[in-house]
């Protein structure tokens, strides 16, 4: 039987005397698609933030199974307002981009006759394996496809001038490219947003 990707057992969340969630028990298998519905103010967003690791339970247990990743699209998604649309989306590949940059830099360093060629070759080989494993040689193409599919604003537009819906699409694009094992969408009430999430 497959292992659960996420489990919560008798979880309680309270702020002082105000109880937000009480005695919540749930388990999800990988690949499950589950909706949390209810009136406003009933703790749906709090539940998702706990699952994303943004908030902690007051009592009980809530845990993501080790080896899995989680990502959340919040109602007001945090973006870097000092960056453009493309710069925010590229952050999904931050680690891989750094490895590609280092790989290219090693090529330059090899031109130095005094370099430690064996050490550079070993590092280059390790980086190539890691970049290959992440399918990281074609990042610009992936970015273009994802940004087109989600109909993002112009790539050079600063995110601080975007509407709320545009900001959510930028954040969703970044999140989908990060490809977390557990994807949480807070208030994906618009059919278009849901269709974007499954593109």
Language model features by range: what are they?
Residues 1-187:
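ABC ATP-binding cassette signature C-motif
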Residues 188-199:
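Single conserved hydrophobic/aromatic residue that forms the stacking wall/gate
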């Amino acid at each position: 039987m497959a292992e659960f990707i996420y489990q919560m057992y008798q979880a309680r969340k309270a702020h002082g005397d105000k109880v937000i969630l009480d005695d919540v028990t749930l388990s999800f298998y990988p690949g499950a698609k589950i909706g949390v519905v209810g009136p406003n103010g009933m703790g749906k967003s709090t539940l998702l933030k706990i699952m994303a690791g943004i908030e902690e339970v007051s009592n009980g247990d809530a845990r993501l199974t080790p080896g899995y990743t989680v990502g959340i699209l919040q109602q007001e998604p945090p973006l870097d307002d000092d960056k453009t649309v493309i710069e925010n989306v590229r952050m999904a590949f931050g680690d891989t981009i750094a490895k590609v940059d280092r790989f290219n830099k090693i090529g330059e360093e090899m031109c130095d006759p005094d370099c430690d060629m064996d050490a550079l070759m070993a590092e280059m080989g390790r980086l190539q394996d890691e970049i290959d494993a992440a399918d990281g040689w074609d990042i610009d193409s992936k970015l273009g496809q994802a940004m087109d599919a989600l109909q993002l604003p112009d790539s050079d537009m600063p995110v601080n001038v975007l509407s709320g819906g545009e900001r959510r699409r930028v954040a969703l694009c970044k999140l989908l490219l990060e490809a977390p094992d557990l994807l949480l969408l807070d208030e994906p009430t618009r059919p278009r947003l849901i269709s974007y999430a499954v593109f």
